[in-house]
């Protein structure tokens, strides 16, 4: 049963909708960031359902927004960057250095670029089917951020 679950959402989407295989290496870093933004948001919302429980949706949304904003993603990549393989670091740097035609509303250019790199990495890992690695990196970032916050308060 576990294997059929990890057959995964991506495969189910492709099979049911009749989509072709996508090679993440052939996608632009901004396209990787586009899908990475969504998958990171989904992982964080799933995490919050467990850690915050059944609460008002607007409160859950505030918690999620605080974690998925560019500044937090920039902090998270700073935490996990030493854990990245050379290939993962290359994807992150491609995303960070990509020329974006949009700008952050509430973040510095530096944070926005680092967040774009983080999202590109998440998108790459997701499309490669490396879900466990993606979630391990997110967990490492969340654990460290939570320890820092706990020490402050």
Report the location of each language-model feature.
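Double-stranded RNA-binding/processing signature
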Residues: 1-153
């Amino acid at each position: 049963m576990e294997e059929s679950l990890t057959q995964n959402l991506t495969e189910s989407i492709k099979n049911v909708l009749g989509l072709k295989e996508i090679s993440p290496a052939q996608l632009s870093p901004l396209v990787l960031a586009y899908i990475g933004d969504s998958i990171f948001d989904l992982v964080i919302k799933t995490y919050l359902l467990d850690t915050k429980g059944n609460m008002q949706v607007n409160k859950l949304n505030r918690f999620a927004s605080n974690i998925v904003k560019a500044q937090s993603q920039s902090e998270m990549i700073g935490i996990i960057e030493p854990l990245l393989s050379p290939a993962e670091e290359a994807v992150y740097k491609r995303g960070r250095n990509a020329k974006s035609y949009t700008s952050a509303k509430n973040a510095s250019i530096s944070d926005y670029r680092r967040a774009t790199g983080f999202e590109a990495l998440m998108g790459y890992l997701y499309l490669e089917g490396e879900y466990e690695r993606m979630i391990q990196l997110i967990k490492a970032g969340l654990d460290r951020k939570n320890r820092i916050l706990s020490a402050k308060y």
